[in-house]
Amino acid sequence: MTRTTTTRKANGGGDTVKYSIIVPTYNEQLNIAMLLALIVEAMEEGTKRKEGRKIPPSSSPSYEVIVVDDNSQDQTQQTIQKLQKIEKYRDILRLKPRKGKLGLGSAYIHGLQFARGEFVILMDADLSHNPKAIPEFIRKQEEGDYDVVTGTRYLASSSSSSSSTTTTTTISSRIMNNSSSTKSSRKSKIKEQECGVYGWDTRRKLTSRVANYLAHVLLNPGVSDLTGSFRLYRKTTFQALVSSMQSVGYVFQMEIIVRAKRGGFKVAEVPISFVDRVYGSSKLGASEIIGYLKGLVSLFMRV
């Protein structure tokens, strides 16, 4: 059986898949093709090694990529539709658009409606999250039969929460082949980094640290990175958690992990590298920061 045949059998039609990767997008035309290529590479190559031994292609996990697009004003949807016509993407790539920007949390919930996997993986579309880390999330989940595995930018790789690190080398080198921008040049200097944030200026790093610190003081979540969005959930766990959720924006990430910990679900962390986007602009502005602070206080009062 060829790899193509195996993939189609696992991912096509109404068959159940093991992993549903949900990717919200808004104006990600320049990133989505690269992201998809890296996801496929990670799933087909990274998961072929278990305990240092290669495993046959037929043992690679079945998966799908669900893109939830919030009515992008560029060619994001058209790019995805073109990618769906490519044979290796045809059976794994699914586009589930919405009419407008309705919040990051609600985008995940929208994608969940279409997820066929036993597990759901949430990640950003702007290449800030390295798909090469996905096999580490999978390995960690299998290692302890965890309900949630969350990526952390703030946990040393020597921590007992995980024995692995991820790199940004692949993304950096590939982007360098397509861009000569200052940001791209900065990314090319990153070599085998462990967990952390790269490419942000001091103000952005400070904002993130303060936001995470405030969240820890008010919520005592029991994880090192409360605001990160690169996560793996058992689908039944995710469904149970979102059924009681009230947040739909960036606060969604905090509320769901707090509810998971307080609800007795098994949660683990995996160190990740977070790299600033090269193409497009950040969705985080003053209104999002104000919304975050309001949401944090609201979350403190009701959770």
Language model: regions and residue ranges:
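Acidic helix N-cap motif at the loop->helix transition within catalytic regions
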Residues: 30-34, 74-83
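Conserved donor nucleotide-binding strand/loop of the catalytic core
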Residues: 62-66, 77-114
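Acceptor/aglycone-binding surface of glycosyltransferases and processive sugar-polymer synthases
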Residues: 98-114, 119, 131-250, 277-287, ...
